[in-house]
Structure formats: structure tokens, C-alpha cells
A protein has these predicted regions:
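PLP-dependent aminotransferase-class I/II
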Residues: 78-85, 89-151, 156, 163
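Catalytic PLP-binding core of fold-type I/II PLP enzymes
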Residues: 165-169
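Conserved beta-loop-alpha segment that forms the PLP phosphate-binding cup at the N-terminus of a helix
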Residues: 37, 41, 55-86, 106-111
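A generic secondary-structure signal for well-formed alpha-helical elements
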Residues: 23, 44-48, 73-80, 162
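Generic hydrophobic alpha-helical segments
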Residues: 44, 69, 73, 137-141
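Cysteine-centered functional microenvironments
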Residues: 20, 24, 52-56, 122-126, ...
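Short acidic-aromatic active-site loops that bind/stabilize oxyanions
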Residues: 25-37, 59, 63, 96-100, ...
Length: 169
């Protein structure tokens, strides 16, 4: 069971988000929303018993969070992509994103949107409980490294939409 934005709490959250109508990602553009986000993340940090170094950003959907996480991974792997992009680049080799066969379709979409291409996404086989098989992941990464492919990210799933399976993270 997954709560949706059409649930009671979801409707209230959507109401508040639309009423604020801000991007809280930068203090400069929206100081009050950024402060609210910091307080909320502090509560989450306390509830989960995480260290003070835990930081984050609140997104409206998991799809956007995945897109931004993969964009950050791409930026870290190829810092010049921000200025020069990926098109026609001969100075970087192929990049690879790994995820399970049960991953949400937003991962496919993010890989395409970020200009990595569908060939950059490797879907790892799952076990009988629909969880990513760690040994298959290790083998895929080793084979790619041997072939000159740079691992960019591993996207684990915590509760697939079809089976609620959780990858062994």
C-alpha cells in the first residue's frame, strides 16, 4: 500500500505546497521556505536518528528526486557537463547507471532526459522476491569496468510500485 497525494494528508500537503508556491532550494530565492525546509528536515533527521551531517531537499515527487539525484551523479562524474554538455563529447567514455528490473520507469526517463541514452541504463536481474541481486550487480559493474565503462550510479529501490519489494541495500 502506498499513500497517494489524493489521501487526506496528501491533499493537505498539496494545498500547503500550492499556497506557498515556492522553490525552497536556495535561501536567496526564498528564505522563509528554505528555513521551513531546514526545520522539517531537522525533524526527519531526529525521527530517524540520523547524524547532524544529514541534509536533503524536499521534492514534490520521487520521479523528480530521482532525476536530480542522477543529475548530481552525472555532474560529479563529469564536472564539465554543466558548461559543455554531453553531445559530441569525445573526451569522456561511456557512463552506466545500474538499477533493478523492478525499478520505477522514472529511472528510464531520467537517464534519457539527462542525455545519457538508454544504453547507459543496465537493469540488474532480481531474485524470487523481486529484489535486485547483489552478486549480479557486482558482476555487471566488474564487466563494465573491464570494458572501459564508468559506473555512474546504482539506483536501489525501497518499495517498488508493483510488488513493494525492497532491494537489499
Amino acid at each position: 500500500y502506498f499513500a497517494i497525494s489524493g489521501s487526506g494528508p496528501g491533499i493537505l500537503a498539496e494545498f500547503l505546497a500550492s499556497a506557498l508556491n515556492v522553490q525552497a532550494m536556495l535561501w536567496r530565492t526564498s528564505p522563509s521556505a528554505t528555513e521551513l525546509e531546514e526545520v522539517t528536515l531537522g525533524w526527519l533527521r531526529q525521527l530517524m536518528g540520523l547524524s547532524e551531517s544529514f541534509e536533503g531537499v524536499i521534492y514534490d515527487t520521487a520521479s523528480i528526486a530521482s532525476l536530480h539525484a542522477l543529475a548530481a551523479a552525472r555532474q560529479r562524474a563529469v564536472p564539465s557537463v554543466r558548461v559543455h554538455g554531453l553531445a559530441g563529447r569525445t573526451d569522456i567514455g561511456p557512463l552506466r547507471v545500474y538499477t533493478s528490473e523492478q525499478a520505477h520507469s522514472s529511472i528510464d526517463k531520467a537517464v534519457m532526459t539527462l542525455g545519457l541514452g538508454q544504453d547507459a541504463l543496465r537493469k540488474i536481474p532480481v531474485d524470487e522476491d523481486f529484489r535486485l541481486r547483489p552478486q549480479a550487480l557486482r558482476s555487471a559493474i566488474a564487466a563494465d569496468l573491464k570494458s572501459g565503462i564508468t559506473p555512474l550510479a546504482v539506483v536501489a529501490t525501497v518499495g517498488t510500485t508493483s510488488t513493494t519489494s525492497i532491494d537489499p541495500i
